[in-house]
Amino acid sequence: DADDLAELLGEDTRQGKYFSAFDADEELVGWFAFSCEGDCVALGLGLRPDLTGRGFGLAYLEAGLAFAEQRFRPSRFRLSVATFNERAIRVYRRAGFSPLRTFDHATNGGVHRFLEMTRPA
């Protein structure tokens, strides 16, 4: 929504945490967000909607993880995903993430169940 977009694009928010991802033709394909929590990097990501479901997810995720490993040198990664997003969960599992716990989170006008996943760097 508009508030989320304004937050993501605001200079105060980005401060070395949010990164745009471009393809070889310099077209925007998505974004990554990284937050260091001790030796763990919490990861957020988004892929341009017209690119989802086309087999790009794993390569996109692996590129972001490689970038974060080089930049932040974590010992592990953590992410959270809505439990209804089964396609993303399959990609995260293929990338080596394992379920850690589920929790409820208020977002976008409702309360949704999320799955926290982790993997070694």
Where would I find each of the regions flagged by the language model?
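Acetyl-CoA-dependent GNAT
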Residues: 1-52, 58, 67, 71, ...
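C-terminal "cap" of GNAT-fold acetyltransferases
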Residues: 74-89, 94-95, 101-121
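Conserved glycine-rich acetyl-CoA-binding loop
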Residues: 45-62, 82-90, 94
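Generic, low-specificity signal for short hydrophobic/alpha-helical stretches with a mild N-terminal bias
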Residues: 3, 63, 73-74, 99-100
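Sequence-level detector for tyrosine residue identity
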Residues: 18, 22, 60, 92, ...
